[in-house]
């Protein structure tokens, strides 16, 4: 009887310790970029972790509420055609990242103003939650001054 109990306990322990598969970080970032370019604010916010961090220059936003309001909601309507060029990426069972360069069209605030183009470097880091969903945990953008689009 003791052997059967130990065998069952061992089986349950092994079943609960399944090894996680690495994320498809390209698919995660494409989902984020597609939602951003389609102005799907709620979808973008839904991809953020509760403890997400956003850094850009000397700006730092902490947590889903602040990042949602001060980065996503305040900038999503002023940008379009976000594109990335990945230079480095990596994944394991709980963390995935991509880093590289980006370009984005900057829409004018007034109709008579010219369109701009923004370029810079990015890092997006995703973490797997306890519910097995991947969420954007860290975003860092370092951009050059916006140039008039030719």
Residue ranges and their predicted role:
Residues 32, 67-71, 84-89, 102-103, ...:
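Hydrophobic/aromatic beta-strand elements that line small-molecule binding cavities or substrate pockets
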């Amino acid at each position: 009887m003791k052997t059967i109990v130990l065998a069952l306990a061992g089986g349950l322990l092994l079943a609960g310790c399944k090894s996680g598969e690495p994320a498809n970080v390209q698919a995660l970032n494409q989902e984020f970029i597609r939602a951003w370019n389609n102005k799907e604010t709620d979808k973008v916010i839904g991809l953020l972790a509760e403890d997400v961090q956003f850094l850009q220059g000397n700006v730092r936003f902490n947590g889903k509420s602040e990042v949602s309001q001060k980065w996503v909601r305040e900038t999503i309507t002023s940008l379009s055609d976000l594109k990335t060029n990945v230079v480095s990426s990596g994944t394991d069972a709980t963390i995935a990242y991509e880093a590289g360069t980006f370009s984005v069209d900057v829409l004018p605030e007034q109709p008579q103003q010219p369109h701009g183009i923004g370029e810079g470097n990015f890092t997006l880091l995703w973490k797997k939650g306890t519910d097995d969903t991947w969420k954007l945990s860290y975003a860092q953008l370092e951009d050059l001054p916006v140039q008039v689009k030719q």
